[in-house]
Amino acid sequence: MHVTLVEINVHEDKVDEFIEVFRQNHLGSVQEEGNLRFDVLQDPEVNSRFYIYEAYKDEDAVAFHKTTPHYKTCVAKLESLMTGPRKKRLFNGLMP
């Protein structure tokens, strides 16, 4: 299982817009055949910080995800909302 944890920091006045933009990516992602989990988490201490927990069955499923319209649209819209680049950490999922 291929797991990615993404940290996204957005401008404080863009939190609601971020949630709506990312909702579309979430709804599309959970429909993908290779997607096992796609959680959008908001930091309770920093309202403008989000974590995305993505689990896919393999790297091919991740590669497919990055070709989808919902992913491409989301990434394009995120640029103006973020305070800096996304931070990604990769993991091998052992026990889902």
Swiss-Prot record:
Location of the protein in the cell: Cytoplasm
Pfam families per the UniProt record, alphabetical: ABM (PF03992)
Annotated disulfide bonds: none
Keyword Isomerase found: yes
Catalytic activity: (2S)-2-hydroxy-3,4-dioxopentyl phosphate = 3-hydroxy-2,4-dioxopentyl phosphate
Main location: cytoplasm
ABM domain: residues covered: 2-91
GO cellular component: cytosol
InterPro entries, per the entry: ABM_dom, AI-2_Isomerase_LsrG, Dimeric_a/b-barrel, LsrG
Alphabetized GO MF terms: (4S)-4-hydroxy-5-phosphonooxypentane-2,3-dione isomerase activity; isomerase activity; oxidoreductase activity
E.C. number: 5.3.1.32
Induction: In the absence of AI-2, repressed by LsrR. Induced by AI-2, via release of the LsrR repressor. In the absence of glucose, induced by cAMP-CRP by direct binding to the upstream region of the lsr promoter.
Record-linked PROSITE patterns: ABM
GO BP: quorum sensing
Top-rank lineage group of the source organism: Bacteria
Keywords: Cytoplasm, Isomerase
Summary of the function given for this chain in its UniProt record: Involved in the degradation of phospho-AI-2, thereby terminating induction of the lsr operon and closing the AI-2 signaling cycle. Catalyzes the conversion of (4S)-4-hydroxy-5-phosphonooxypentane-2,3-dione (P-DPD) to 3-hydroxy-5-phosphonooxypentane-2,4-dione (P-HPD).
Family named by the database record: Belongs to the LsrG family.
Oligomer status and interactors: Homodimer.
Protein name: (4S)-4-hydroxy-5-phosphonooxypentane-2,3-dione isomerase
